[in-house]
């Protein structure tokens, strides 16, 4: 092999890429995707892709690409037929016959399977052999064009078809299809390099029915009709280098709206929704203006498209130059509650256009930078649009969320470093999944990861200032946009990738500040800080003695050393102090500025410069302190528990102007049920200039305090007189005024107060009759005729209020509840709910909010024993065809019923829906709800916990969810919640089995198979070079399928070694090719001259959970159909793994000669495998993963 070609390539790469070292031996520069047939009836897609690649090493003879679900018909490189192999170990993670049921084992195997096809490790499911005729061409590093014909039949992930079963043509029915998925999932719908770090330009062509519209990335160059005018082809060009993971598609009979403010923006929605689309998107141009202004940089693409579709995978999915939204975000001008939520979704998607789509990431460990920046600039937009109060409330909410999650699960690591120096190889050993790859992450963990990323960006901004922060973003964007315009210097494109080190370097260049300690604290390690604070005032020294303790031993916590701000409000004003938190300092002395109370009355200055009169009678006469706050700016990711007197919390609630401080004091006052607390809360409710969310929280706190003070409470029920004064008629206080929701603050308060009032209880722990009558009157006299806004959310809250008023039934002699002996109050509630439900059928409300509330209320009545507990109603509402919010509410009730009544039948019904429901989001939600409200947990004895359930869930996560990463990770979460990490307790002890130890090359007798053996297997996989004599027997998840040419003698020796040790053929039930085996054990026999024939096995098995029948003849039928009849010539072996193909040979009835040769395990191969043999290229070849036949309880080993 001449080395001359290699060196220049390597030098080039180093010089141009500035730190980005591609894991692939080639550079992709352009890709064509052409889908020329989409059949909505059959839910199938036919097309081809063409990838233009430049080899970067001379001896490139294998090209690995990503492809899942696609049936590959034919591969050509520069118009020469190329042989290929398809191997996807993620289809079935653990061997179907393995009796392993512990999650530790599964997580290791799953992480290995994912990295075996991870493009960022240079791997892929599809391995293409470069024809020998092109080897000289490759050595000269000349361009290769790879042409792949493929089809997709009823895809279960990646592309989602929505085909309503009504009359009419597909366009009239509103049938549409769109791409979807979690992280990099483009491989599910066309072959590509599915990595965020491999950028190229794109040409996208889609041929669809004339009534349909295809929306994709980039500029629509032209639309061409066929001669008969029945079909048309949309041609899109994306000239900005983009990763395949950011390519998307939506096809449907869309109505089109060009944005009236920005003509380069186009909006698409399903038929008849155009008026809603106009209103919903009318605001978008302001978001554009805001981002362009703060980033001082134009929007990077030449156009932007928003597509609103049904049955969305997530509410917002951002792709290069287009975003796909759920159609449920559309709303009219009459809707109040949805408006801010939809605007937030639009703003989020646009932030991700800059950071996430235009600027991509180098590797998974740099993901936090993109998620952090897009979340941070979205926060800035929120501050400008909804105001500082809303922004600070959001930051506090996000902080509470991440703190609660980290304390519960043990920490979220933003920048995982693997296998490097001091860092442990498993930085997240407390988790039940690997964090080395996005596809193994729990969905909840990933949401929290995004939340933490933007909070950390805010901490960086606190450290270097917002001005510098925005300069850094501008620098990243400018470099990227310069790079993106270099059409012929693709090595420059790596400037469009962001890495953690590059980002930090930018920060230090721009700001000159060293933020390394901050990064070390929050990015390179997981955990949050837990502070406990208390104080004493030393009158003699006029000093505040503050004691701050930390808990850094609990899971999810870390030790904090550094500055901490404390704000003290004294009589003479508000003072900030910065304490230095050291290793062991607990006590801090803070000098006070004011002497204790003066006699002369004077106004007290607040933090914001305002001066107010205060009634100081409640305070301690010896102390000038009004209230104290620790870390008021939330500049540490922390939880603070601070002790101060009740009057201090009351002053803080009344007079502190920061909404976060007010929220904190409301939370603290729950512990002080006194008349003074009651008064402070009532004052806040009456204050119109107080932030509406604080007033809403005060309602619920007041209800709790009233319940604690029930024996001493005087006057009408809490909040009733206030509500009457604010919202009822003067002349008739029990009749509510005609609705007028012009003031949104009072609208939210009017909606919330009755819900909080319904939580009031009298001395007998029942809801006071007066309150229930009051709520029923609100419903009865509700009048929305003169209101310009819809009252559907308000009415839904009234039903929630009715549900809140329900208390447990008192049963006499176990009487059965019937409608005749219902408690009269409950009868009234039930009548209202029934009336509302019937009204909904005639006049449905927006998003069916009322039906949702009714279903929840019925479940409350069931749980409290007023109506018979029966899931039938909920099951009927949960069926496919109802609006998604109704389905989720109904399913929530069924999940709850399953837990309370321990119903195996309902659990099975739910599991069946997880497998078979047409909507991916619903399947995901059911798993999520079962995890949050499980029928039992790992430490409980439960009749539901049995071997059949373990097997069922194991199969679900092992092979039943391979089409959707999110679903699989959800199944793993559920399995963990129910059974924990080790072997489920309800299983019998496994029989004695043999464990094959690949490291020692010997079998070990082992009663319970311990995860250590897994570690052994993994090392064997990751370091194949350490066992030259075991080349053929490699772990199916091997991540380093080495590229060097194979010495065939070694292969034959290893085959002899393995066949001698593992007598696989003698074993009748080798599961290598049962229908449920993943493609890792399927042979793809691809004859060279079979242009266009369907020669690859379909990689789309119909997963079902009734996997009782193991490999019977019928099961193999689909596989055999896919083999080619011409494949009876001797088969050449071409990768290390394929050498062990004989394990599954007895499943193929085509290659008899090959089988005869091996029948007695004599490896006397007559033909030579020479590097330049032309014969070799004419022969078909086979592939099968050697270890595919390996059960963890292996057959006997005999030497």
Curated annotation (Swiss-Prot):
Keyword Methyltransferase: no
GO cellular component: a single term: nucleus
InterPro entries in the record: Aminopeptidase_N-like_N_sf (IPR042097), ARM-type_fold (IPR016024), Peptidase_M4/M1_CTD_sf (IPR027268), TAF2 (IPR037813)
Coiled-coil ranges (or none): none
Source organism phylogeny: Eukaryota, Metazoa, Chordata, Craniata, Vertebrata
Region (Disordered): 1-23, 1067-1102, 1136-1199
Residue list for modification Phosphoserine: 1185, 1188, 1194, 1196, 1198
Pfam families found in the cross-reference section: TAF2_3rd
Protein name: Transcription initiation factor TFIID subunit 2
Keywords: Disease variant, Intellectual disability, Nucleus, Phosphoprotein, Transcription, Transcription regulation
Top-level taxon: Eukaryota
